[in-house]
Amino acid sequence: MAHALYLRGEYGRSLGMAENALIMKQGSYPISELFLHLSASMACMSLKDIDAAKAHFGAAWDIARPDGLIELIGEHHGLLQGLIEACLKTQYPDDFARIIEITYRFSYGWRRIHNPDSGEDVADDLTTTEFTMAMLACRGWTNAE
């Protein structure tokens, strides 16, 4: 539900849903926790709360890295709005490269479904970093941010 709220632009509610689910969990559920932290990161970025976004992304990374559960991170590259680059590119270059490869494969498949269904033609000639910068600019972020 947190992801659905995010997609509807209800970022505050999305964040609240994800954080409440994380607080109320009983036991360890790594896949669910990973997804909830990524959803919270996405919402925080849309709310321009970068510190909270990085904290949730860091928690997601702590869950994902030991077991190589990076597929979800790669699939959410665009929605994470630069967090992968900011948090992993320098400190974890090999993992970053693997995530970006996942992102390219996921995006290729997504465009093959999205373009015919929507009647729009989403371009594929930007790098992941260029795409992130363009998306942040479209959302009103400044270069300094």
Set out the residue ranges of the language-model regions.
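Helix-turn-helix DNA-binding segment
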Residues: H114-E145
